Every structure is written in structure tokens, then in C-alpha cells.
Amino acid sequence: DRKYMKVLIAPDKFKGTISATEVSQSIAEAIDDLHEVTIQPLADGGEGTLEIFGGGNKMSVVSGPLGEPVSASWRLDGKSAVIEMAQASGLHLIQEKCFTNPIDASTFGTGELIRTALERGAEDILVGLGGSASTDGGLGALQAMRPLKRYSSIEINVACDVQTGFIECAGIFGPQKGATDTQIRFLENRLRRLA
């Protein structure tokens, strides 16, 4: 005798293998039809954040992590925008080329997306911070957004799942971006000067 249940399926992605939506659908398929299933994929601010908000409905060509042009998807609904840093400044954009460059990688393209969202009328911008190739502390993004006074009347929020200190980011995330011990020390010093 089986009991009826309400089931909420709310996973994040399995990084590098399957999206949160695909995980949700796979779990739902395995659950008995006798139960009421609600699917609500989640994201941690990294890759997949844009998908959770309905996917991109805009495409912009911006600077990739090493300055090369990349097509980056983002979302604009009315006056609200969602930008996923990984779309413009993502580590996967460099890894596809089989090399990394943790010193020169920049968030400039993410700033270009933020600037574009502002120019298209966004007043509330959410930026998902995960999956970047850069340890520039957001300096590249700020340079692309100039003049910064244009942003004084809008709200920009960030989504991330870590509480790592600003300077400690180099030591924690530098290795996954290909940084050597010497490069990590350089990145920490650069972040310290920026702070």
C-alpha cells in the first residue's frame, strides 16, 4: 500500500556533466506517477544560473577572458537583467583552447555585458559570479563599465555560493584556473593592491 507524496526536485548542476534541468528531469522520470512532482532546478551563481531564470534571450559579442571576441548570452526581462559571468569570462572558454592564462585573464567582457544591459534599459542587474577564468577582482569589468557614475541609479546584485575573502580568492581558486604557486603569490599581491 503506497502513499501519495508531493515531491520537490531542486538540484544544482553536476559540474561538467549535466545541467540542473537535466538532473531534475532524470529524477522526475524515476519517480512513480502516483506522486505529484514539482521541478525547480537551482544554481549557485555559476554556470547554469542563466538557465534557471529562463535562459538567455539576448546575445552580445564581447571580449572573452583573453580579449578574443565571444558570443555571450544574457537575459533581459523588462528592466531586469541576468548576466552569467561564465558566458563572457568563463574558464571553459580558455580550457576549450587547451591552455590557461591566469595572469592575463580578465572580466572585461562581463563588464561589457553589464554596460550593454544598462544601455538597453536594465535598472536591476543580477550577475552570477561563478566559473570565471579570471582572478582580477572584477577590475576588468569595472574598466569596461566606465564611466561608473552611470550606474548610480540602478541596482547591481551578485550571486555566488562562496564566502572566500577577496585576497584569499587567488589561493583558493587560482589552481583551478591553472595558476602556479608563483602566479598565486602575484595574484594575491595584485588583489591586495586593488583592495
For each predicted feature, which ranges?
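N-terminal loops that bind phosphate or other acidic moieties
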Residues: 4-195
